[in-house]
């Protein structure tokens, strides 16, 4: 029996030693693993510190070389045939007026005629239609003038009262202004923005006592076109002003460089 007790004590001692060894192994493994994570984090931190991120700006003032002027005219009549005849008369008057002002015929585009029926309606206290009586037709036609003679079309759009006084019910919209060489302009601005970004990166590296390395990444920002000398807001999705003849275009380039 005494021998049995001694054997049990020896077993407990051996088990305690095994447990202690297992504990040491687990702790050692945890230390090794945490050391690996810390080293890796340090490595990544140094990697991030070896990168310069800069944003360059390209900006250009320009003047539109294309104008688009939209307008419309209407005629009302109880008889559809009479309404068409009156609208045709106004269309010819408008076309002849534009030609007399020096607008080329190929620059004038008339849309198809829109027709709507007119009714005289009465309503109850709940705004439901109580009765309606047909009163005639309203015919509408749009006309668009697109030209590179910007100033000429501008002046004509301001003189439409001459047509209105002659009986043509013309509704004139504000002209829209465009630039036909926008693609070329955009390429030049990208080059300018890239150059500006690189100069900024070189200056930052110089101030840090380092040298600029290879380009890691480049990303074009939003392209904006706004009116010159205006308080027009920039948009995250990009602005494209068409109401002003004189415009300013802006674009940004985001570059990431290695430093050494």
Language-model features, listed with the residues they occupy:
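Short, Lys/Arg-enriched N-terminal segments with co-localized hydrophobic residues
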Residues: 1-14
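Short, charge-dense linear interaction motifs
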Residues: 12-260
